């Protein structure tokens, strides 16, 4: 079976926004207008198609990135059918990982902003992630029907807060309860959607007389933005020639694809106005897979040669697994983006990261939580595979004979932990399986067993993140668990370099003995919260090569539980430069134990310190409560980094230790009578004050 939609008619897009900007509602309207849903699902009644987890429907927020496919031929049926693969991403900061991995596999993004709240804190995080992966984007300013809606204020904030170059394609006709439609600034016509059929049909009308002057001003702005990078068209425009619609759109598309401008649309998804024109803009101004640069990777040979794959069905197959999800009926679903080539169900491919062969059992196209089985997928497709055994997020799947490893995704380290204990003996085994599966799905979630207490410790990106993990254990795996208080994920490191650190493991009491002897140097690495470097400087074969990896392994095992307070050790280098061995008694185990002893001894002499996670906190508060909010942040050992003015208040930026932020939401609510909001994300690890680290170490020693 050959490709039914040419690759130039594909659009792989993500829909991203701050929580409650109306992103899921916007996606629901897209599914309605593209003909997939016959009844519009509303978030507030728990019926939204894209929010398919029970927790999402209860809380009215999106947690996982649901993927779906839709087709669009234009509001006026002016295009050939375009295939739009949509990923709906969460707006809560605890689920930033979902946004990050979606951005990695997308070609374009739609940023949804609330016309009342404008650019809110999480919007900045999402914008930075789109910048990181160089994703072209357009904006949809939603909720134009709400009290306090202000389109031009939101446009200005995209420039001032995000550093974007916003160019409106439309102006709203009226706002709040008087919002009637939009003005198309290219055609210079008013678009009004009919309420009788939920906005499926529309009319082009003349621009209202009281808006002609404003429309002319923004029409000129649009044309000037279009011709700015094209000298020939600029001259033509300045000479008084009228540019054609085709010329304007072509230049806007080029500039949008180069990330030079962000085109702005507006509407009210809830009132069925504006999403239809947004769909047209997705097709006209966001890239097809063959518009973006060839994907970069390395060949998995010894030289690790840089290689590229183009969005072409004839190129060797390459794809990136960007999400693993558990399905109650088929087990693991592996979501993947095909960058080049074709793969059919039943084909064998290589997981080049793990050097393992995998077989595509079945391939399915996803529509939220519904599945449609398909036989093959092509370059540019996003689909899910059933039957892949050992694939994790970020792995590359590729042609067996032409291997490539695509650039990997980076995942943040968890910053908060809680202990979980099964309530009954029956829950014990089920809990292990449940946590293993959930950890496979989510790279920002970790599970470990505390060596001393033997408790199971789970770690994640925030309180809500872990709350939902515990909730999913109960709902999906029927595991009841008692949950401990949140704990901070501290780290350990050293400040000084120490040398001549010896580790000996010698046992010779009848029978075959054990002999391992190493001499190492420990040194601090640049701070970052995760580094480890092992340098083998053995000369003259004083320790045979076969034991070197065992020495490295022995040290790495010690890194998991630091000697200071049992927290992971980071930012440390180890140089192995001397030792000795015994022809008969030496073994890998003996050298592993000798290395562990040397590391423990050296760590204590190298001025060990505890590192604590610092969070970037952004609080939006009315002016009346500013003093109280700042005072409270100072009491929490926070450092105020700066403030920005809002029309009715301030945004306060601060850096605060995570250990001081537990229960902050409740405290902020009571301080400001519920009128302030905040967001928080991990920033960096820094040395904990001695009064804090002494307390933690004493607690550990008890």
Curated annotation (Swiss-Prot):
PANTHER family: RIBOSOME-RELEASING FACTOR 2, MITOCHONDRIAL (PTHR43261:SF1), TRANSLATION ELONGATION FACTOR G-RELATED (PTHR43261). The lineage of its organism: Bacteria, Pseudomonadati, Pseudomonadota, Gammaproteobacteria, Enterobacterales. One of its GO terms (molecular function) is GTPase activity. It comes from the Bacteria. One of its GO terms (cellular component) is cytoplasm. This is Elongation factor G. Residues 8-290 form the tr-type G domain. It comes from Buchnera aphidicola subsp. Schizaphis graminum (strain Sg). GO terms for biological process: ribosome disassembly. GTP binds at residues 17-24, 88-92, 142-145. CDD domains: EF-G (cd01886), EFG_III (cd16262), EFG_mtEFG1_IV (cd01434), EFG_mtEFG_C (cd03713), EFG_mtEFG_II (cd04088). It is found in: Cytoplasm. InterPro entries: EFG_II (IPR041095), EFG_III (IPR009022), EFG_III/V (IPR035647), EFG_IV (IPR047872), EFG_V (IPR035649), EFG_V-like (IPR000640), EFTu-like_2 (IPR004161), G_TR_CS (IPR031157). Transmembrane segments: none annotated. Coiled coil: none annotated. The keyword Transport does not apply. Keywords: Cytoplasm, Elongation factor, GTP-binding, Nucleotide-binding, Protein biosynthesis. Catalyzes the GTP-dependent ribosomal translocation step during translation elongation. During this step, the ribosome changes from the pre-translocational (PRE) to the post-translocational (POST) state as the newly formed A-site-bound peptidyl-tRNA and P-site-bound deacylated tRNA move to the P and E sites, respectively. Catalyzes the coordinated movement of the two tRNA molecules, the mRNA and conformational changes in the ribosome. It holds the Pfam family EFG_IV. Belongs to the TRAFAC class translation factor GTPase superfamily. Classic translation factor GTPase family. EF-G/EF-2 subfamily.
């Amino acid at each position: 079976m050959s490709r039914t939609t040419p690759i130039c008619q594909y659009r792989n897009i993500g829909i991203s926004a701050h929580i409650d900007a109306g992103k899921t509602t916007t996606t629901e309207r897209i599914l309605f207008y593209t003909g997939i849903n016959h009844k519009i699902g509303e978030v507030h009644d728990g019926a939204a198609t894209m929010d398919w987890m029970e927790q999402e429907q209860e809380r009215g927020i999106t947690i996982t990135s649901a993927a779906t496919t839709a087709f669009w031929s234009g509001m006026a049926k002016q295009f050939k059918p375009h295939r739009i693969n949509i990923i709906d991403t969460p707006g809560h900061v605890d689920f930033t990982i979902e946004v990050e991995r979606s951005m990695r596999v997308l070609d374009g993004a739609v940023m949804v902003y609330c016309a009342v709240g404008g650019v809110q804190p999480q919007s900045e995080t999402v914008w930075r992630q789109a910048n990181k992966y160089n994703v072209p984007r357009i904006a949809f300013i939603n909720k134009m029907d709400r009290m306090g809606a202000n389109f031009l204020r939101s446009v200005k904030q995209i420039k001032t807060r995000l550093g974007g170059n916003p160019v409106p394609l439309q102006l709203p006709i009226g706002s709040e309860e008087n919002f009637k439609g939009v003005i198309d600034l290219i055609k210079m016509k008013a678009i009004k959607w009919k309420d009788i059929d939920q906005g499926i049909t529309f009319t082009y009308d003349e621009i209202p007389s009281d808006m002609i002057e404003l429309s002319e001003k923004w029409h000129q702005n649009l044309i000037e933005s279009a011709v700015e990078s094209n000298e020939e068209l600029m001259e033509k425009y300045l000479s008084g020639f009228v540019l054609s619609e085709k010329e304007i759109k072509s230049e806007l598309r080029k500039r949008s694809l180069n990330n030079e401008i962000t085109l702005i649309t507006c509407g009210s998804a809830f009132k069925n106005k504006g999403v239809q024109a947004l769909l047209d803009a997705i097709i006209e101004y966001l890239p097809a897979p063959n518009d973006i640069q060839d994907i970069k990777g390395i060949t998995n040979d010894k030289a690790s040669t840089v290689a590229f794959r183009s969005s072409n069905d004839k190129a060797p197959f390459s794809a990136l697994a960007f999400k693993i999800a558990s399905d109650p009926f088929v087990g693991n679903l592996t979501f993947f983006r095909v960058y080049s080539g074709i793969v059919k169900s039943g084909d064998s491919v290589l997981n080049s990261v793990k050097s393992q062969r995998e077989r595509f059992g079945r391939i399915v196209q996803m529509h939220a939580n519904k599945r449609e089985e398909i036989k093959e997928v092509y370059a540019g497709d996003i689909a899910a595979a059933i039957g892949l055994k050992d694939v994790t997020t970020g792995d590359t799947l590729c042609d067996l004979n032409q291997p490539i490893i695509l650039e990997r995704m980076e995942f943040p380290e968890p910053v908060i932990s809680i202990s979980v204990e099964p309530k009954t003996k029956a829950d014990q085994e089920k809990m292990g399986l449940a946590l293993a599966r959930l950890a496979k799905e989510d790279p920002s979630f970790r599970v470990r067993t505390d060596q001393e207490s033997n408790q199971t410790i789970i770690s994640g990106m925030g309180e809500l993140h872990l709350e939902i993990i515990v909730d999913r254990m109960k709902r999906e795996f029927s595991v009841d668990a008692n949950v401990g208080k949140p704990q901070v994920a501290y780290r350990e490191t050293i400040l000084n370099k120490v040398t001549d650190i010896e580790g000996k493991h010698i046992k010779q009491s009848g029978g075959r003995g054990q002999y391992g002897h190493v001499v190492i140097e420990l040194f601090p690495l640049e701070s970052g919260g995760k580094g480890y470097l092992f340098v083998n400087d053995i000369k003259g074969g004083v320790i045979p090569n076969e034991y070197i990896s065992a020495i490295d392994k022995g040290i790495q095992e010690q890194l998991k539980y630091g000697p200071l307070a049992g927290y992971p050790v980071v930012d440390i280098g180890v140089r192995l430069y001397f030792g000795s061995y015994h022809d008969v008694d030496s073994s890998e185990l003996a050298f592993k134990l000798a290395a562990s002893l040397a590391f423990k001894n050296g760590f204590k002499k190298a001025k060990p310190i505890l590192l604590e996670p610092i969070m970037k906190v952004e609080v939006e508060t009315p002016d009346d409560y500013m003093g109280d909010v700042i005072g409270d942040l100072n009491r929490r050992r926070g450092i105020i980094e700066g403030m920005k003015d809002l029309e009715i208040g301030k945004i306060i930026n601060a850096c605060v230790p995570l250990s001081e932020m537990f229960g902050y939401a409740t405290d902020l609510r009571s301080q400001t009578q519920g009128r302030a909001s905040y967001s928080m994300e991990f920033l960096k690890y820094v040395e904990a004050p001695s009064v804090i680290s002494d307390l933690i170490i004493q607690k550990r020693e008890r």
